Curated annotation (Swiss-Prot):
Keywords: Mitochondrion, Transit peptide. It comes from Phaeosphaeria nodorum (strain SN15 / ATCC MYA-4574 / FGSC 10173) (Glume blotch fungus). Signal peptide: none annotated. One of its GO terms (biological process) is iron-sulfur cluster assembly. The keyword Transcription does not apply. Belongs to the GcvT family. CAF17/IBA57 subfamily. This is Iron-sulfur cluster assembly factor IBA57 homolog, mitochondrial. GO terms for molecular function: transferase activity. The gene is CAF17.
């Protein structure tokens, strides 16, 4: 069964008045971050298996935007998929008028920040490559709202950085340099923090690992992030599992993109979703979902490659693709999959064409690499809780966890 995740933020704030001086946005994330020499040295000495199982990593590919003002909550409420009246951190998305994702975001808000500012305020965490576009989007809708909207430095005395932790590493983050924390609602065992920029680590007696291990964690759990994995203005929020990540409040009022989102919820049919996948080159049989992660796996499938069924000889069929590669590191990755064609899950009354034992693959430089979708128990549990046929929408796993804490 799925692990229950807790959404209660680690609410710690000891900062002085936020410096709202604008700075240049950092470079777009390319899948790997370049760490200082000392940290790269640690990475070369650390066990790959250990780093995959548990670790902390800075996320230089994420930027922060500061939003504050007497009507900031009302303003943001009309632009995002979640309830912006909250006073604890949450996951959400900005949509365009057609209901397509502009960007996925974390909204960092906590009581101490609001008290410090004297009104509702937050940090909007977004893919660094989309920060400027999001700034323009916010200013375009500002109208007569009295708001402060500014980039947040990632360096210097007043800078703030985004960090991630996974496995047991979060137990080492003990009120030591972090500003706020959140148990990542997108998947079990993932955690997120804001920390002062001058911190080289957020965990006592624990050094950071390369950011690619954070990406591996996301891929293992099937968590897409940022513009490379959610192409702006074309990705639907349900296809990116934003609904299953507690990123959509289906009961909230009007916001941009709501019409298609609610219509999809009422029809109850989402035929494609991003799932974790494992790769296997050569030999008979499907890829083993329990096989160790191998970052050096080759040949490496590339984003955009079509996934097709394999015939009895192991060759790719010439029919309609059943999916498409979204991202990959080694033998793990993400793929947009036609649910009823590539898994045993059903999303419609008529069902799909999936048969037990069906195998899938991609062509990488003339070689067939097998692709195995991975469907976690917790993923199925979330999907059935939210989209189960004939059921009323149940309380989210986040709401249940919060009630237990209260």
């Amino acid at each position: 069964m799925a692990s229950r995740i807790l959404a209660a933020p680690v609410q710690r704030c000891r900062r002085s008045q936020h410096d709202r001086r604008p700075i240049a946005v950092s470079a777009t994330h390319n899948g790997f971050s370049r760490l200082p020499t000392a940290l790269r040295s640690y990475f070369t000495e650390a066990s790959t298996a250990q780093a995959i199982a548990s670790g902390i990593a800075p996320l230089p590919h994420r930027s922060l935007i500061f939003l504050s003002g007497p009507t900031a909550s009302k303003f943001l409420h009309g632009l995002i998929t979640h309830d912006a009246t909250r006073v604890s951190p949450f996951y959400a998305a900005f949509l365009d008028a057609r209901g397509r994702v502009i960007c996925d975001v974390f909204i960092w808000v906590w009581p101490e920040l609001i008290a410090q500012q004297g009104h509702w305020a937050c940090y909007i965490e977004v893919d660094a490559g989309q920060a400027n576009a999001l700034m323009l989007h916010l200013k375009r809708h500002k109208l007569r709202h009295k708001l402060t909207i500014s980039h947040v430095p990632a360096e210097g005395r007043d800078g703030i950085k985004v960090w991630a932790a996974w496995g047991d590493a979060h137990k080492q983050v003990k009120d030591w340099g972090e500003i706020a924390g959140l148990q990542d609602p997108r998947a079990p065992g993932m955690y997120r923090y804001l920390a002062n920029a001058d911190r080289e680590t957020i965990a006592r007696d624990m050094q950071p690992v390369d950011t690619k291990f954070y990406d591996i964690q996301r891929y293992i759990h099937g968590v897409p992030e940022g513009s490379a994995e959610m192409p702006p203005y074309s990705t639907l929020p349900m296809e990116a599992n934003i609904d299953l990540s507690s990123g959509i409040d289906f009961k909230k009022g009007c916001y941009i993109g709501q019409e298609l989102t609610i219509r999809t919820k009422h029809t109850g049919v989402v035929r494609k979703r991003i799932l974790p996948v494992r790769f296997h080159a050569g030999g008979a049989g499907a890829a083993d979902p329990q096989a160790p992660v191998n970052p050096s796996f080759a040949p490496q499938p590339q984003p955009g490659m079509d996934i097709r069924t394999l015939d009895d000889t192991g060759a790719l069929s010439k029919g309609r693709p059943t999916g498409r590669i979204v991202a990959a590191i080694g033998n793990v990755g993400l793929a947009t999959c036609r649910i009823e064609n590539m898994t045993s899950m059903r999303v419609s009354t008529e069902g799909g064409f999936y048969k037990e034992g069906t195998q899938f693959g991609v062509d990488v430089d003339g070689q067939v690499v097998r692709v195995e979708p991975v469907v976690h128990d917790w993923f199925v549990e979330r999907k059935e809780a939210l989209w189960g046929r004939g059921e009323k929408m149940k309380k989210s796993w986040v709401e249940k966890a919060q009630e237990e804490l209260d």
